């Protein structure tokens, strides 16, 4: 069995894994133990009261966090004509059609988000086997297939997070960086949970948001008392 590092021993001693902490206390604990030499991400895991085996209970969407994610996001847009100009003005990093598709086929994928106008899906559709496994395939459910590409670019650049439950019915995403203030992290988390509540499937029964835990890149998970949000 691997030995625990001094940091992990300190975290285990300082965090009660059986306790749900008041949100401000939970975030203070996270920041206390975020001692990596880089600016750690603050991640959240939300256990949902859904049956992920049923397609009509799967939760997928996107929302813009009020304080962003702290990440610089590179955006590629498949579009043409006036939409291409609008995407450029909105701050898109890469814009094209067949030429951009050829770059993707060559493995040149220096971007984090892919957006497409509906007329470009005939080109993007050919890239499903490349973009799909990387979670980059545009999808109207998360607003990345849209006639308003400029708005989608602005959302991506301003701190939009996409979410999708895993096979255990858990949403994993980020709500910022350890350098954010506790208030910024709290407001980002509240915005995410509000978006999830709106995305509740009509067929989901009982308690929808069952458990919320926050963690940093190299830290332990801290369960949050939802009544404090």
Curated annotation (Swiss-Prot):
InterPro entries (alphabetical): Ribosom_uL1_bac-type, Ribosomal_uL1, Ribosomal_uL1-like, Ribosomal_uL1/biogenesis, Ribosomal_uL1_3-a/b-sand, Ribosomal_uL1_CS
Gene Ontology CC: one annotated term: cytosolic large ribosomal subunit
UniProt keyword 4Fe-4S, yes or no: no
Pfam (any one): Ribosomal_L1
Highest taxon, organism lineage: Bacteria
Family: Belongs to the universal ribosomal protein uL1 family.
Name of the featured protein: Large ribosomal subunit protein uL1
Originating organism: Actinobacillus succinogenes (strain ATCC 55618 / DSM 22257 / CCUG 43843 / 130Z)
Upper classification of the organism: Bacteria, Pseudomonadati, Pseudomonadota, Gammaproteobacteria, Pasteurellales
């Amino acid at each position: 069995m691997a030995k625990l590092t001094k940091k992990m021993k300190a975290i285990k001693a300082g965090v009660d894994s059986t306790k749900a902490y008041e949100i401000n206390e939970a975030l203070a604990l996270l920041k206390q133990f975020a001692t990596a030499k880089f600016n750690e991400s603050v991640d959240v895991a939300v256990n949902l009261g859904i049956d992920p085996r049923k397609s009509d209970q799967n939760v997928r969407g996107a929302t813009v966090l009020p304080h962003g994610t702290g990440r610089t996001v590179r955006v590629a847009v498949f579009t043409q004509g006036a939409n291409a100009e609008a995407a450029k003005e909105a701050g898109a990093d890469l814009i094209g059609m067949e030429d951009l598709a050829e770059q993707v086929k060559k493995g040149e994928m220096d971007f984090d988000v892919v957006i497409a106008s509906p007329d470009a899906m005939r080109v993007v559709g050919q890239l499903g086997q490349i973009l799909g496994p990387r979670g980059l395939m545009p999808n109207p459910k998360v607003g990345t297939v849209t006639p308003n590409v400029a708005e989608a670019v602005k959302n991506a650049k301003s701190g939009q997070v996409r979410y999708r439950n895993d096979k255990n019915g858990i949403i994993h995403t980020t709500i910022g960086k350890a350098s954010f203030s506790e208030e910024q992290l709290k407001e980002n988390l509240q915005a995410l949970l509000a978006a999830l509540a709106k995305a509740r499937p009509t067929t989901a029964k009982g308690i929808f948001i069952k458990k919320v835990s926050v963690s940093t890149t190299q830290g332990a998970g801290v369960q949050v008392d939802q009544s404090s949000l």
